[in-house]
Amino acid sequence: MSTAVTEGIEVTVRSTFRPERSEPGRFLFSYTVRIANQGEVPAQLVSRRWIILDASGEREEVVGDGVVGQQPHLEPGEHFEYTSFCVLKTPHGSMRGTYRMVRDDGQAFDATIAPFPLVVPGSLN
């Protein structure tokens, strides 16, 4: 699990290995993200940037609008939660990134997604 707070936006991520959807050389992980506005100003998530690293050092960058087809607008005290998936070629790696947020006054900033592990249980022993 990882948590980061940037300008009142808290991003918490939990990842889970999905053995039923994995096979050798293709390891599927789900991750659940909770984005909470702990600040005093409404803000909208407009885009995302993920950096995915596997155990061999291979790096993939994913950039796009919104998350799961949405651009959630969060009033102070509100949160948004979603689950998505990532496939690695190795049994462990990590993800990190940023969400581009825009406050109602037009000010934009990048909310940090702290690094979190993607690990097949027992693969690091």
UniProtKB/Swiss-Prot annotation:
PROSITE patterns: APAG (PS51087). Residues 3-125 form the ApaG domain. It holds the Pfam family DUF525. InterPro entries: ApaG-like, ApaG_domain, ApaG_sf, Uncharacterised_ApaG. PANTHER family: OS05G0170800 PROTEIN. This is Protein ApaG.
